[in-house]
Each structure stands twice: as structure tokens, then as C-alpha cells.
Amino acid sequence: MAVKDRYMSKIKQETKPWIKRFGRLGYFAFGGVFILLGVLAFMTAAGAGRAKDSSGALQTLSRMPYGSLLLFFIGIGLIGYVIWMVLSAIKDTEGHGNSRRGLSRRIGNFFSAAVYTSIAWNALRFVFGQGDGGTSEQTWSAYVLAQPFGQWLTGLTGAGFIVFAIVQFMKGVRAAFMKEFDTSKMNKQMICITKNTGRAGNIARAIIFSAIGYFLIKTAMTADPDDTRGFDGALAELAQQPHGKLILSILALGLILYGMYAIMKGIYQHMTWEK
């Protein structure tokens, strides 16, 4: 216990206040992206469009009134989220430690930083009128399949998505994420709201990621990049199943709740190094 206290004390001394504020802003932007994805998925379920991934959602937002201004704040906010994730991976600013589980979470934060760097870049590209130049999942998978051991790499990536989905699902069911919140600053109603939104949101995200993993494994088995589905493709496939519109509506609500959960995490995240 004394060793851990000294470890957290070192983190507390090294973490600058502006970095923590920037990280909180990042969670707000992170949550905003998922709320936008959920709203667009709802529109798809209602027959008013097609499910979109983050790039498609940003493109839609760019065409709305004041969309460029919102995209600017999302882009800057996500840069804050990326910085926070990188620091969490390298400096362990969230105090995960050096155990096997702690290191796996820190590595996961590094990959999360890579993904949201791309989304932040796309958001700012739309702000400056240089968007709509993304590369499709099929193009990427075709490139990977053409490499030595490409099918194995694609299959392992799919398996990674499914493993992540299982972890995310269990995290939602058990409400294990509540350990990340400073509940001393929350009233009972806010704790209840956070727990329920976090549960629903994490489970919804797990279902979508498991679908993406399934299609990647299918791509590896058939060696056909057309079988690959990204975020939007996975939602579109789910919508085509029996009761698909109902399923998509539930997942859309889950994405919105996940966004709300992320915003609350930005407000109440339990930072043990804060005074």
C-alpha cells in the first residue's frame, strides 16, 4: 500500500493542472461524437438516412448551421483527449499501475489515442474545407490482405475487436467503470444516472464492436475485402436483420447514453492525484 501511495504521489506531482483540464475537455468532445453518432443512427432507423461512421457524422455536421464552429471545438477537444490518452499510456496519469491488467489498459489507451487522432484530424479538415477524402474500410482491408500474412493479421484484428467487445460488455454489466468516478462529488441521483447510462452505453458499444470483429474475421476467411464493415457498415447490417429498425433504435439510444456517460466522466472522473 505504501508503494502504491508513493507511486500515486509521484503522478500527482508530475501531472500539470492544464493537462487535466485539457483531458476533461477531451472527454466532452469524445462524448459529443458518440451523441452525434447515436442521433444519426436514430435518423437511419426512422428512414431519414444511412448509418454513418465518425467521418460520415462529421461530414453531416459540417453541412449544418454553425457546423464548422462545432467541428472546430470537437477537433480541439479530441486533441485534448488524445493527449490525455498518450499520457495515460506513457506516464500512467490514471494510475493503472504496472500489473498485467494495468499495462493492457495503458496499451489500450495508446491505441485509443491513435484512433481519435484520426477523428480529430478529420474534424479539423472539414473545418478548413479539406474533408471528404477518407479511405474506406474495404480499401484498408484490401491493402492488408495483399501483404504477407495479411489474412492472419485481418483475422487477429477481428479477434481483438471481439475480445475488446467482451471486456466492454462485462464492464457495462458489472458497472466496473464506477471505480473511475469520484463519487464523493456526486449525489445519489447523479450516481444512479451515471451507472445506468454507463451500463447501457458500454453494452451498446460492445455489440457494435463485436459486429465489426465478426466481419473482419469473415473477411480473413474469404479473403474478400468487400466483407469488411466499419462502424456504419456494422449498424447497417444489424438494421437488415429481423426487427432491425428496433435493434438499431436501441443501439442508437445506447450510443447517445455512452456519449452522456463520457461527458459525465469528464466532469467527475476520479483523479486521485488532484488536491
From Swiss-Prot:
**Annotated GO CC locations:** plasma membrane
Keyword Membrane applies = yes
Which positions carry the signal peptide feature in this UniProt record?
A: none
Report the transmembrane regions from the record: 25-45, 70-90, 107-127, 149-169, 203-223, 247-267
What InterPro entries does the database record attribute to this sequence? Answer: DUF1206 (IPR009597)
Q: What is its main location?
A: membrane
Q: Where in the cell is it found?
A: Cell membrane
Q: How does it sit in the membrane?
A: Multi-pass membrane protein
Keywords, alphabetical: Cell membrane, Membrane, Transmembrane, Transmembrane helix
Q: What is this protein called?
A: Uncharacterized protein YxxB
This chain's source organism reads Bacillus subtilis (strain 168)
